[in-house]
Amino acid sequence: MALILERDGRACVWCGRAIDVGLVEATTEHVVPRIKGGPSWIENEVAACRRCNGQRGHLTPGEWLEECERRGWQPNRQALVRALTALDTAIKTHGGQRRARNYARSQLRRLTRAS
């Protein structure tokens, strides 16, 4: 978790709150959910506060990012694009993960098109 927090600036990628300080508990969240074939690799995990991790539910990264913006939060689109790009590269390197690759690529297209 320490590497992920350091990489993501010790802030929740969804709401922008500083995490792992005081009352905001740090978690890591799978960008591509395990139920969608997402591996438990560092490339597929981002820093998230417990609230955002729990509230995202089964929304895609693109859907949850839009919801976070609607709520007036400050999601880190660049961190999500970076994670999805890194995951795609890792899948190319390691092989397999067809479901996760397709999901990651579709979300990457959505996030880069909307920016």
Q: Where in this protein do the model-derived segments appear?
A:
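Generic anion/oxyanion-binding catalytic loop in active/binding sites
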Residues: 1, 34, 38, 53
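Short cysteine-rich loop/turn motifs with clustered Cys
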Residues: 1-26, 49
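Histidine-centered nuclease catalytic patch
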Residues: 16-45, 62-67, 72
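A detector for short metal-coordination/catalytic motifs
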Residues: 43-44, 51-115
